[in-house]
């Protein structure tokens, strides 16, 4: 719940402003970590909603949330982007994952490897 609430609250705070910052280009590593962070949030949301397909994955509440927090903090550090800009990146990735049915399931195997490699 906390991860979902965090994403929604930050997304609302990142609503486009008239003078919104351009989104930074991300490295492959940064883009992959962001994609996985969002995928973990979507899986966590589905798990909380009782969606049976999400039960195929480990519980995302704690580890997924920590991965999301660390990834967004690292993006701010590495790109110099502010919170609003990073949350715009999150929302863009959320839209990209949501526009193709099954996309989250496609990325989760690699994301779970990334999560394990992170040591969380």
Task: Show the residue positions of the predicted features.
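Short linear motifs at secondary-structure transitions and domain/linker junctions
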Residues: 16, 42, 85-87
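Short N-proximal segments of mature Sec-exported proteins
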Residues: 22-78
């Amino acid at each position: 719940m906390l991860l979902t609430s965090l994403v929604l609250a930050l997304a609302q705070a990142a609503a486009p402003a008239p003078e919104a910052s351009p989104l930074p280009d991300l490295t492959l590593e940064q883009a992959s970590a962001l994609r996985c962070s969002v995928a973990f949030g979507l899986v966590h949301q589905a798990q909380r909603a009782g969606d049976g397909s999400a039960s195929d994955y480990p519980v995302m509440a704690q580890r997924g949330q920590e991965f999301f927090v660390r990834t967004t903090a690292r993006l701010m550090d590495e790109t110099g982007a502010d919170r609003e800009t990073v949350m715009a990146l999150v929302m863009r990735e959320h839209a990209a994952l949501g526009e193709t049915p099954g996309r989250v399931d496609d990325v989760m195997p690699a994301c779970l490897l990334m999560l394990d490699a992170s040591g969380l």
